[in-house]
């Protein structure tokens, strides 16, 4: 009996070991894991989804129409790019952004910031803003027409700078500060479009919406709403709201990209340089400008203008000398401003020191109806109810709780750039053929299908092709939108679904043109004739392609520099708001350089033909 009990126990033990081993193997094979979250694991943890393949990708597409898809697509492509952000100025999205450790940023002002303040990504931006040279001679009588600003990279009030003080010694010294990111600043919100435009036509809606919601959420009843400049009020509220979430600040575009940094503590940035800015007249050892006033014996009328025929010989000599100095300094100041333009233009293709984590994009698109025209839409439209605004801010808070890591995000901008590089030349070439001058004949069909057939045959299956492999239009779409990283968040799926929609429309259009015109080519090749429907088919094909090009709204298809610019020129895209080329107000009928008033939109828009400009153009524009 003892032997039997021992044998039974041994047998049971062996069976238990085998059973445990089998369960372990089963869990390994089928991915059985605990559903409980680890200690302090956030509920917002993202997880991988099943692989998206050619035969199942439709199952993962989110519900988004073509207009919203193009809006998402173009917002992604314009992100952190200066020229596209000005061409498509009304942004409606918040992009999570990271400024890596070691990145240098700049500020020009009279003191070291102790609260939130503006920093520039380019030193030319801060230098141009901060170095405000005194005027000499007759120019000193004029109110200096400087850039409007809110203290961007400095601490000047909004509006034109005041007239120069009567004495050089009374001018407050300006400091040029250089900061270095002490860590990865991984909780920035980049506001797309021309978000530093200082306008009321929609460009600043992302800040206004956030400010309004914050006011109610934090019960900010006495924060100087009526006394403070709008964007300083927005910045103060946003930083106050974001502090519990670790918000580093916001990023906007003006002429170059600027950062509103919420906290200048050593944990975030370190001050690596602080220079007193030297005026050119000081550097050259020239005296301060002569004070031209009645008190100093100068003949001035009631409007403060010189009475030229009452000038003494000494006064004439002073003016002749100082007017000459002013002419020289005007060249210096023009180059200073042009350098800012050049630095900004360098980011037309991207501000690559800032990285975007697209996984946590928060956008007004697809939440309510937003007009697809980025020149004529508003985030704060009637469809954006208070409840929807609260939902957007709630999504921002959830994203900030997680923090951003661009290395874990698919680079959607890169993926979309590839699509445009592939399809823009094809679509434009087909359009040019279909819009050829002269009579419609078989050559149009032959030339157009030479392009479309090469595309379609790539995906055409042989008669004995197995259904095991993808083919046709469906596979064509999949080939171009197949993600190279797993989609993990709602934003990922929304962005990818937008790509599916956009590429689907493009593929459909290419196939439609091919199906319309190939029979005409076949008829001409076999019978040396075309059908009576040739003209109608070409016109249908033309309207299909041209309508698609208009609906896509791709900048490359509509905007181009007039020529290859010379080394001393930049291809200038007008900006909205402060600029060395002057302040451009979207709602004005006064056309600024490179803009025109669009009657249908009732606002200024940027001309499709961009111009090369140099320092002389800047000086001429300033004098008008």
UniProtKB/Swiss-Prot annotation:
It is found in: Secreted. The keyword Cell wall biogenesis/degradation does not apply. Glycans are attached at residues 68, 150, 219, 366, 441, 447, 464, 528. Residues 141-174 are annotated as: Disordered. InterPro entries: YOR389W-like. Residues 1-29 form the signal peptide. This is Uncharacterized protein YOR389W. It comes from Saccharomyces cerevisiae (strain ATCC 204508 / S288c) (Baker's yeast). The lineage of its organism: Eukaryota, Fungi, Dikarya, Ascomycota, Saccharomycotina.
């Amino acid at each position: 009996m003892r032997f039997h009990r021992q044998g039974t126990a041994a047998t049971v033990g062996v069976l238990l070991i085998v059973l445990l081993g089998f369960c372990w193997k089963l869990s390994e094979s089928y991915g059985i894991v605990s559903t409980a979250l680890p200690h302090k694991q956030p509920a917002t943890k993202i997880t991988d989804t099943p692989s998206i393949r050619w035969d199942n990708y439709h199952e993962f597409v989110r519900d988004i129409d073509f207009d919203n898809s193009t809006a998402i697509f173009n917002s992604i492509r314009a992100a952190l790019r200066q020229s596209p952000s000005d061409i498509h100025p009304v942004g409606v999205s918040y992009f999570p952004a990271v400024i890596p450790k070691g990145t240098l940023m700049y500020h020009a002002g009279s003191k070291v910031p102790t609260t939130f303040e503006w920093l520039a990504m380019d030193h030319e931006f801060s230098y141009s803003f901060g170095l405000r040279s005194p005027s000499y001679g007759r120019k000193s009588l004029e109110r200096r027409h400087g850039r409007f600003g809110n203290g961007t990279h400095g601490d000047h009030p909004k509006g034109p700078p005041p007239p120069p003080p009567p004495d050089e010694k009374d001018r407050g010294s300006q400091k040029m500060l250089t900061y270095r990111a002490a860590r990865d600043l991984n909780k920035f919100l980049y506001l797309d479009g021309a978000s530093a435009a200082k306008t009321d036509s929609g460009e600043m809606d992302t800040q206004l919406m956030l400010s309004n919601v914050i006011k109610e959420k934090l019960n900010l009843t006495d924060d100087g709403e009526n006394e403070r400049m709008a964007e300083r009020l927005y910045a103060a509220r946003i930083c106050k709201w974001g502090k519990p979430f670790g918000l580093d600040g916001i990023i906007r575009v003006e002429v170059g990209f600027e950062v509103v940094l919420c906290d200048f503590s050593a944990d975030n940035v370190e001050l690596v340089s602080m220079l007193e800015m030297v005026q050119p007249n000081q550097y050259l050892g020239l005296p301060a400008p002569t004070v031209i006033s009645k008190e100093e014996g100068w003949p001035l009328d009631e409007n403060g203008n010189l009475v030229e025929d009452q000038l003494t010989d000494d006064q004439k000599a002073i003016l002749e000398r100082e007017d000459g100095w002013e002419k020289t300094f005007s060249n210096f100041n023009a180059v200073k401003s042009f350098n800012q333009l050049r630095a900004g233009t360098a980011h037309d293709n991207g501000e690559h020191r800032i990285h975007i984590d697209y996984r946590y994009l928060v956008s007004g698109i697809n939440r309510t109806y937003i007009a697809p025209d980025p020149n004529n839409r508003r985030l704060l439209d009637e469809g954006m109810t208070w409840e929807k605004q609260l939902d957007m801010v709630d999504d921002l808070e959830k994203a900030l709780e997680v923090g951003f890591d661009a290395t874990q995000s698919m680079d959607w901008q890169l993926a979309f750039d590839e699509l445009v590089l592939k399809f823009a030349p094809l679509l434009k070439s087909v359009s040019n053929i279909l819009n050829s001058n002269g009579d419609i004949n078989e050559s149009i069909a032959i030339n157009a299908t030479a392009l479309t057939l090469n595309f379609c045959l790539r995906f055409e299956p042989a008669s004995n092709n197995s259904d095991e492999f993808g083919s046709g239009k469906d596979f064509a779409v999949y080939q171009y939108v197949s993600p190279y990283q797993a989609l993990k968040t709602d934003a990922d799926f929304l962005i990818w679904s937008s790509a599916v929609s956009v590429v689907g429309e493009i593929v459909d259009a290419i196939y439609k043109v091919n199906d319309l015109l190939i029979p005409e080519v076949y008829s001409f090749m076999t019978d040396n004739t075309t059908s009576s429907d040739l003209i109608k088919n070409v016109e249908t094909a033309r309207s299909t392609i041209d309508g698609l090009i208009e609906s896509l709204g791709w900048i490359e298809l509509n905007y181009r520099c007039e020529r290859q610019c010379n080394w001393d020129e930049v291809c200038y895209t007008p900006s909205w708001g402060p600029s060395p080329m002057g302040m451009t107000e979207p709602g004005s009928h006064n056309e600024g350089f490179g803009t025109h008033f669009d009657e249908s939109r009732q606002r200024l828009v940027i001309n499709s033909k961009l111009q090369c400009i140099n320092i002389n153009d800047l000086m001429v524009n300033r004098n008008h």
